[in-house]
C-alpha cells in the first residue's frame, strides 16, 4: 500500500509538467501556423487564378506598378491585410478572413471596409476568453513525503488593438503616402520647368556669342551658362529657380533652332544637381560639294628635238630619210647648206703602222644646237694642207694628237689632181656607212678611190644616172668578154 501511494505521487509529479508543456507548445504551434497561413493567403491573392482554380506562376503580377514618370500606379490596390491574432486550431479553421480593401477616388474620399467593427470586436472577445487558463491542483499527503502543493497562475494575454484602430492607422498611412506622391509630382513639374528654362538660356547664350572668321583665335569665347540656386524645404515647397542671365525672353525661342550647342560648354561647366542634359549635337553641318577628280591620262612624251646617243643611228634615221632631196635641190641651185653642225676631221698616218691606223677616221662632234637649223656651208677638210717636207697636217683636230707624216713620193701629182676635182664630199655619205673606207691605203702611197663613190658624189642626179649606166654597161661588157675568151 505504501508502495502504490508513492508510485501514484511520482506519476502525478511527472504528468503535471508534461501537460503544462503541451499547452505551451500548442500556443506556439498555433502562432506559427497562423503566420504560415497568412503568408500562403497573400501568395494566393497575388497569383492569378485560371478556370481550374490553379495558380499560374508564369503570369504573376507585380506588387506595385510604376509609370514612366516614376509614380506608383496600383499602390491603392494592395493585397489583403490579415489581422494577426493568437487563435486555437478550431478558431483558425472557422474564423473568417478580414481584409481591408481601399480605393482612392479623390484625395479625401475612401472606400468602406467589408468587415463591420462589431463582428471584429466579438471575435476578439472570444479569443481572449478561450486563451485564459485557470487550473487548481489537488494536494497529496503521505507518511514519508511532505505535502506538495502545485499552484498554476492563470495565463492571460493582453487584448490586441481593435479593428477600428488598425483601420484608422491604415487610412493615416495611405493619406501620408498620397500626400508624398502629390508633393513628388509637384516637385517633378517644377524641376522639369526649371530645366527647360535652363536649356533655353544655354541656347540663347550660344546665339549671342560672335562668330569668328579668322583661322587664329587668340581670345577665349565667353560662355554664358546660367547658374541656378535651388531651395528645397522639408514641407514639400515648390522649387525656386533664379536664373542669373540678363538675356530677354523674346530672343530665346527664335534662336533655339538656328544654332547648335557646343560640347565644350557642357563639359567645362558644372551642371545643376539632379539634372541630365541630353542635347543633340552636330546637326547643322553644311555638306560640301563633292569634287570629282579628273580622269588620269598617261602623259605623252614628245620625241622631237630629242638627240640620240649614237651618231650613226642619227644619220640613218634622220638625215638619210629627210635631207637627200634637200641636198639634190641645193646642188641644182648651186648652194650647199648643211642641216646640222657635224664636222669631219681627217688625219693620215704612216704606211708602216698597222692597217687600222692607216684608215681615215672620221671624228664626229655633236654640237649643242638643235637639229634642223641652218649652218654655214660645208668646209673642205683639205683646205689647208702643207705639202712641204712631205707633211700633211690636219687643221681642226678636237683632240691633241701629234701630226703624222707620210712619204708620198710620186703621189704629189695625184694629190694635186684630187684637190682640183670639181666635186665635193658630202659628210652624210660617210656618216651613213657602218665601216669607214680605206681610201688612202697603199704601200706606194697612191690614192684609191671607189667608182661608186665618185659617181654618187659628183654632179647632179642626171649625171649620177648616166654614170651608173656607163659603169653597169662596162661591167656587162667585161663579163661577156671573159666568157667569150
From Swiss-Prot:
The keyword Cell membrane applies. It is found in: Cell membrane. Its main location: membrane. It comes from the Eukaryota. Induction: Up-regulated upon milbemycins A3 oxim derivative (A3Ox) treatment. Glycans are attached at residues 30, 86, 96, 444. Residues 1-20 form the signal peptide. A lipid is attached at residue 467 (GPI-anchor amidated glycine). One of its GO terms (cellular component) is side of membrane. Keywords: Cell membrane, Glycoprotein, GPI-anchor, Lipoprotein, Membrane, Signal. It is a lipid-anchor; GPI-anchor. Residues 468-485 form a propeptide. This is Predicted GPI-anchored protein 27. It comes from Candida albicans (strain SC5314 / ATCC MYA-2876). The gene is PGA27.
Amino acid at each position: 500500500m505504501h508502495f502504490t501511494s508513492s508510485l501514484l505521487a511520482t506519476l502525478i509529479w511527472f504528468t503535471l509538467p508534461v501537460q503544462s508543456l503541451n499547452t505551451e507548445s500548442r500556443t506556439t504551434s498555433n502562432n506559427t501556423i497562423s503566420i504560415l497561413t497568412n503568408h500562403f493567403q497573400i501568395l494566393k491573392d497575388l497569383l492569378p487564378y485560371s478556370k481550374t482554380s490553379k495558380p499560374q506562376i508564369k503570369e504573376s503580377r507585380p506588387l506595385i506598378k510604376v509609370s514612366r514618370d516614376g509614380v506608383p500606379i496600383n499602390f491603392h490596390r494592395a493585397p489583403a491585410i490579415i489581422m494577426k491574432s493568437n487563435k486555437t486550431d478550431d478558431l483558425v479553421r472557422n474564423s473568417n478572413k478580414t481584409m481591408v480593401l481601399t480605393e482612392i477616388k479623390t484625395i479625401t474620399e475612401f472606400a468602406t471596409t467589408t468587415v463591420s467593427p462589431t463582428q471584429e470586436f466579438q471575435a476578439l472577445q472570444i479569443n481572449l476568453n478561450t486563451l485564459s487558463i485557470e487550473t487548481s491542483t489537488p494536494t497529496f499527503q503521505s507518511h514519508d513525503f511532505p505535502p506538495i502543493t502545485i499552484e498554476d497562475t492563470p495565463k492571460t494575454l493582453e487584448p490586441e488593438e481593435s479593428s477600428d484602430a488598425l483601420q484608422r492607422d491604415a487610412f493615416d498611412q495611405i493619406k501620408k503616402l498620397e500626400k508624398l506622391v502629390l508633393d513628388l509630382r509637384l516637385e517633378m513639374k517644377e524641376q522639369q520647368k526649371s530645366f527647360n528654362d535652363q536649356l533655353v538660356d544655354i541656347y540663347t547664350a550660344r546665339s549671342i556669342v560672335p562668330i569668328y572668321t579668322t583661322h587664329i583665335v587668340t581670345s577665349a569665347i565667353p560662355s554664358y551658362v546660367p547658374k541656378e540656386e535651388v531651395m528645397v524645404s522639408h514641407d514639400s515647397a515648390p522649387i525656386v529657380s533664379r536664373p542669373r542671365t540678363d538675356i530677354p525672353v523674346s530672343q530665346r525661342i527664335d534662336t533655339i533652332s538656328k544654332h547648335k550647342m557646343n560640347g565644350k560648354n557642357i563639359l567645362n561647366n558644372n551642371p545643376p544637381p539632379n539634372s541630365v542634359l541630353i542635347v543633340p549635337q552636330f546637326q547643322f553641318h553644311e555638306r560640301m560639294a563633292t569634287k570629282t577628280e579628273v580622269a588620269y591620262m598617261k602623259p605623252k612624251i614628245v620625241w622631237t628635238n630629242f638627240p640620240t646617243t649614237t651618231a650613226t643611228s642619227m644619220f640613218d634615221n634622220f638625215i638619210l630619210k629627210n635631207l637627200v632631196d634637200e641636198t639634190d635641190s641645193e646642188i641644182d641651185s648651186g648652194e650647199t647648206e648643211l642641216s646640222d653642225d657635224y664636222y669631219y676631221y681627217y688625219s693620215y698616218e704612216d704606211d708602216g703602222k698597222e692597217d687600222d691606223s692607216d684608215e681615215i677616221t672620221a671624228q664626229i662632234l655633236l654640237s649643242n644646237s638643235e637639229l634642223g637649223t641652218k649652218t654655214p656651208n660645208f668646209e673642205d677638210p683639205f683646205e689647208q694642207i702643207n705639202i712641204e717636207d712631205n707633211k700633211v697636217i690636219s687643221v681642226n683636230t678636237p683632240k691633241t694628237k701629234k701630226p703624222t707624216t707620210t712619204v708620198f713620193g710620186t703621189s704629189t701629182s695625184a694629190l694635186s689632181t684630187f684637190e682640183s676635182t670639181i666635186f665635193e664630199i658630202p659628210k652624210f655619205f660617210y656618216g651613213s656607212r657602218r665601216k669607214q673606207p680605206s681610201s688612202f691605203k697603199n704601200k706606194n702611197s697612191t690614192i684609191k678611190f671607189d667608182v661608186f663613190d665618185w659617181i654618187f658624189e659628183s654632179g647632179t642626179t642626171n649625171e649620177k644616172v648616166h654614170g651608173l649606166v656607163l659603169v653597169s654597161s662596162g661591167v656587162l661588157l667585161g663579163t661577156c668578154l671573159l666568157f667569150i675568151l
